[in-house]
Amino acid sequence: MNNHFKCIGIVGHPRHPTALTTHEMLYRWLCTKGYEVIVEQQIAHELQLKNVKTGTLAEIGQLADLAVVVGGDGNMLGAARTLARYDIKVIGINRGNLGFLTDLDPDNAQQQLADVLEGHYISEKRFLLEAQVCQQDCQKRISTAINEVVLHPGKVAHMIEFEVYIDEIFAFSQRSDGLIISTPTGSTAYSLSAGGPILTPSLDAITLVPMFPHTLSARPLVINSSSTIRLRFSHRRNDLEISCDSQIALPIQEGEDVLIRRCDYHLNLIHPKDYSYFNTLSTKLGWSKKLF
């Protein structure tokens, strides 16, 4: 065993037997290598592991040096919002569909992870967004997002009227089905489907992408990640909400604004040494191959 990582957490929310098989393989392999292993409580229960050290996501974040998330991008997003608050590196084994964030191949994960544990990896920081629903700058409800914060109707699709302020300066008003505020990490997710640009992960930028705007002049906007975005509403209807990574929803009541800014902490994401962001884009999005 090397000194790069001593304590490793195993994280995920298994939905099918193949994911559980990967969890069990990973646990037993790490134990034979002499690492201290903490297994997320739900996984330990599903696998019926005995005499195993378990913990919540927060406890894994506090105690472990590395968290291995087994699952798809949704599993990674759910775990990473919590793990990003702690000094822990995170890597993913893909058991989902696209796998933009979980880039270890499950069929070759053991060898790839062995190289990572030896210190052969690429490290990068991904910033998060913090969203607040507040009234007169009094914080009421707050959440974070790794991919995006989305303004949308609560139940029935309809047009929304709102104003956008950037650093407290009026930028534009809009009538649309909603607005996607995305990080570079989220630029290949919901934002991409809505016609937003792809941003490389190292960019300190945020995109604002209209959803079905009621004007042909509405276009995606890219701003500095240090900016604060404020959304104000006409409140002709009271069923609006924002969602974070399509996993957490915060309702918006009459008289409330939404504030969105970059979080103070980052997700410490790591990849195998041969990782290439552009190769990932080409593979996942079906881009053309090299001509010569």
Swiss-Prot record:
GO CC, one annotated term: cytosol
Cofactor: a divalent metal cation
Location(s) in or outside the cell: Cytoplasm
Enzyme class per UniProt: transferase
Family matches, as InterPro entries: ATP-NAD_kinase_N, ATP-NAD_kinase_PpnK-typ_C, NAD/diacylglycerol_kinase_sf, NADK
Activity control: Competitively and allosterically inhibited by NADH and NADPH at physiological concentrations, whereas inhibition by NADP is only slight. Inhibited by p-chloromercuribenzoate and HgCl(2).
Result for mutant: residue 175 to T: Exhibits NADH kinase activity in addition to NAD kinase activity
Mutation effect (residue 175 to K): Does not exhibit NADH kinase activity in addition to NAD kinase activity
Keyword Lyase assigned: no
Gene3D superfamilies in UniProt: Probable inorganic polyphosphate/atp-NAD kinase, domain 1, Probable inorganic polyphosphate/atp-NAD kinase, domain 2
EC number: 2.7.1.23
Sample GO molecular function, one term: NAD binding
Keywords: ATP-binding, Cytoplasm, Kinase, NAD, NADP, Nucleotide-binding, Transferase
Record bears the keyword NADP: yes
Amino-acid positions noted as binding NAD(+) in the UniProt annotation, renumbered to this chain: 73-74, 147-148, 158, 175, 177, 185, 188-193, 247
Record: active site: 73 (proton acceptor)
Any single GO BP term: NADP biosynthetic process
pH dependence: Optimum pH is between 7.2 and 7.5.
Activity's thermal dependence: Optimum temperature is 60 degrees Celsius and half of the activity is lost on treatment at 65 degrees Celsius for 10 minutes.
Catalytic activity field: NAD(+) + ATP = ADP + NADP(+) + H(+)
Family: Belongs to the NAD kinase family.
Known function: Involved in the regulation of the intracellular balance of NAD and NADP, and is a key enzyme in the biosynthesis of NADP. Catalyzes specifically the phosphorylation on 2'-hydroxyl of the adenosine moiety of NAD to yield NADP. It can use ATP and other nucleoside triphosphates (UTP, CTP, GTP, dATP, TTP) as phosphoryl donors, while nucleoside mono- or diphosphates and poly(P) cannot.
Subunit structure: Homohexamer.
NCBIfam families named among the record's database cross-references: PRK01231.1, PRK03378.1
Name of the featured protein: NAD kinase
Species in which this protein is naturally found: Escherichia coli (strain K12)
Higher taxonomy: Bacteria, Pseudomonadati, Pseudomonadota, Gammaproteobacteria, Enterobacterales
Gene name per UniProt: nadK
